[in-house]
């Protein structure tokens, strides 16, 4: 009975380890080579961005 419990706990630990490794691999892949069109922004992309331009004036207000 104790032998079966040890096998059960070992199976759970190996499953959790496998899930952890897969998650870390996917996160590492995203950090190394983000997909084009992905919502992830790398540090280099943040440094190269231009400040956003303001909204154009509404035509009915006119330019002052």
Swiss-Prot record:
Membrane topology: Single-pass membrane protein
Region annotation (Required for targeting to lipid droplets) ranges: 1-37
Polar residues bias locations: 42-51
Sections of the chain in a coiled coil: none
Subcellular location, record wording: Lipid droplet; Secreted; Membrane
One GO biological process term: cellular response to hypoxia
Gene Ontology terms, MF aspect: signaling receptor binding
KW Cell membrane (keyword) present: no
Induction: By hypoxia (at protein level).
Region Disordered, residue ranges: 42-64
Gene Ontology CC annotations of this record: cell surface; extracellular space; lipid droplet; membrane; nucleoplasm; secretory granule
InterPro entries given in the database record: Hipoxia_HILPDA
Domain of life of the organism encoding this protein: Eukaryota
Stored Pfam families: HILPDA
Transmembrane segments: 7-24
Record keyword DNA repair present: no
Role, per record: Increases intracellular lipid accumulation. Stimulates expression of cytokines including IL6, MIF and VEGFA. Enhances cell growth and proliferation.
Protein name in the entry: Hypoxia-inducible lipid droplet-associated protein
Organism for this UniProt entry: Mus musculus (Mouse)
Lineage, opening ranks: Eukaryota, Metazoa, Chordata, Craniata, Vertebrata
GN (gene name): Hilpda
């Amino acid at each position: 009975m104790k032998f079966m419990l040890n096998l059960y706990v070992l199976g759970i630990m190996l499953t959790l380890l496998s899930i952890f490794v897969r998650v870390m691999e996917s996160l590492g892949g995203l950090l190394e080579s983000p997909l084009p069109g992905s919502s992830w922004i790398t540090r280099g992309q943040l440094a190269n961005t231009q400040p956003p331009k303001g909204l154009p004036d509404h035509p009915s207000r006119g330019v002052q």
